[in-house]
Each structure stands twice: as C-alpha cells, then as structure tokens.
Amino acid sequence: MKKAILGKKVGMTQIFSEEGEVMPVTVVKAGPCSVVQKKVEDTDGYNAVQIGFEDKKENKTKKPEKGHFEKAGVNPKKHLTEFELESMENLEVGQELTVEQFEVGDQIDVTGTSKSKGFQGTIKRFKHSTGPKTHGSRFYRAPGSLGSMDISRVFKGQTLPGRMGGNTVTVQRLEVVDVDKENNLLLVKGAVPGPKKGLLKIVDSVKAKS
C-alpha cells in the first residue's frame, strides 16, 4: 500500500465519457487529513501511519486525546485510522494529505459501513422464497423448517431473522475518474459502501492491474 486517505461519501451522479457513454460515479470528499503518528518496525514491530480526518472542538476532546494531537502539532480530529504502508520516507508527523496523491485512472479499494436495515426477516435478509399465496396458506413469509426432528437442535450458521446491514464492506478495484484538487473531491466509477456522509477509507488497490 502506497496511498491512503480518509473521506466522506457525498452522493452519486453521472458523467459522460469522451466516447459519449454515460458513466455512474460516486463523489467522495477525501481529506485533507493530517499525519498524527508514525510507527516504525524498530520500535513498534511494523510500519504504519496514523492519520486524522475532520477537526473536532477542543471542549469535546478528552485530555489524553489532546496530548496525542498536541504532540503531533495538529488540531484534534474526529476520526483516527491507521494504515500499514510500504514506504513512509516522504511522510512526516503533522504533514497534510490531500487528493493530490491520486491521479485519473488509479485503481483504489474503498472501505465503508453498509447501510443498516434494522431487524429483518429471512426473505429480505437472505433472499428466501416466499410460501404459497393461495388456497388458505398461512405460510407466506415464515422462515420454514430449521432442521430435522432427530437432531433436536438448530445448526450454527442457519439463516434466521436478525439485524441486517451495518457491516464493514470493501469494494475493490474502483477506478478514479476525476480529481478535483481545489475542492478535495474524488470521482470514483461505480458505487461505494454506506450512506451519504458515511466515513470511507481509501487506499490504492491490492489487485490493481496495469
């Protein structure tokens, strides 16, 4: 991993390619982020960088957090995330990271939290088939059999009703279509996980093809 940044999902729109084809894109406000801490293999056992995104009011920042940010010489941040990087020679504590590190055509991996759907049944949650709708049937949206009579228990992993969504999801090999350096915006081809204003982690793709 060579590039990393935090951002928020603005929404989706569409643009036209040079060939005149309609292209669905997601607008992401990425950065600016500040380097809060560097971890090196000699002292921490691995190489990583901790970056912060979005300023936070000082009166809402706890004392240990204040000391952490003051040591780095940056304003308190709402979001802190650590990324393991191959090379950190060009990164220094207090440095600002922007969308300028990305270029049109780059392939990236975007991680976010999927939209929460609340408590849902098996038909919505796992795409189960419904029961018959006629001839006095009372079996329409029920989950059905959970196992045989002899075992007298339910096996682990059975598809049952429960909380749906709100999971960490990563979409790989998305293409950067445009970079707006003035407004810190990335236009990414396709959809990314999560709702509008959802936090996103953006890194260069581990499966990038040249």
UniProtKB/Swiss-Prot annotation:
One of the primary rRNA binding proteins, it binds directly near the 3'-end of the 23S rRNA, where it nucleates assembly of the 50S subunit. GO terms for molecular function: rRNA binding; structural constituent of ribosome. Part of the 50S ribosomal subunit. Forms a cluster with proteins L14 and L19. InterPro entries: Ribosomal_uL3, Ribosomal_uL3_bac/org-type, Transl_B-barrel_sf. Belongs to the universal ribosomal protein uL3 family. It holds the Pfam family Ribosomal_L3. One of its GO terms (cellular component) is cytosolic large ribosomal subunit. GO terms for biological process: translation. This is Large ribosomal subunit protein uL3. Keywords: Ribonucleoprotein, Ribosomal protein, RNA-binding, rRNA-binding.
